[in-house]
UniProtKB/Swiss-Prot annotation:
The lineage of its organism: Bacteria, Pseudomonadati, Pseudomonadota, Gammaproteobacteria, Enterobacterales. GO terms for cellular component: bacterial-type flagellum basal body; plasma membrane. It holds the Pfam family FliMN_C. Belongs to the FliN/MopA/SpaO family. Keywords: Bacterial flagellum, Cell membrane, Chemotaxis, Flagellar rotation, Membrane. The keyword Coiled coil does not apply. This is Flagellar motor switch protein FliN.
């Protein structure tokens, strides 16, 4: 069996394909979500009570800091202090997801010893939601 050496310096991995592929998928997801929201808002079958129940459901919110692809051999070399460089640049907005659906873009903030996200744009599909009950 080959001995694995520990490395603390990793190359920045280039992957131009991910952004192009993700952008297409994101746009299609947004179009599908927008259609669902229009159907939901125009539906006469939804009563006020049903909407109240729906709006009280909790959702998981995830903020994506970035992505990277590494070879398994590089992953096995990870150790304390190893660095993994992401494709995201410092000035790029973070993607905000609700139950794995892209809902907004934001920037990282720090307040009261906690990280947070300041929303800088909301996807058009969310702007059309009728929240009145």
């Amino acid at each position: 069996m080959k001995k694995v050496e520990k490395k603390d310096n990793f190359k920045k991995f280039k992957n131009d394909n991910i952004y192009k592929k993700d952008d297409k998928n994101i746009n299609q997801e947004l179009i599908n979500e927008e259609k669902k929201i229009k159907n939901f808002n125009s539906s006469n079958n939804e009563s006020s009570n049903e909407k109240k129940i729906l709006f009280d459901i909790e959702m998981n919110i995830t903020v994506e800091l970035g992505k990277s692809k590494v070879k398994i051999k590089d992953l096995l070399n990870f150790s304390k202090g190893s660095m993994l460089f992401l494709q995201r640049k410092k000035e790029d907005p973070l993607k905000v997801f609700a139950n794995n659906k892209l809902i907004a873009l934001g920037e990282i903030v720090f307040s009261n010893n906690k990280y947070g996200i300041r929303i800088i744009s909301i996807n058009n599909s969310l702007n059309g939601i009728n929240t009145s009950v």
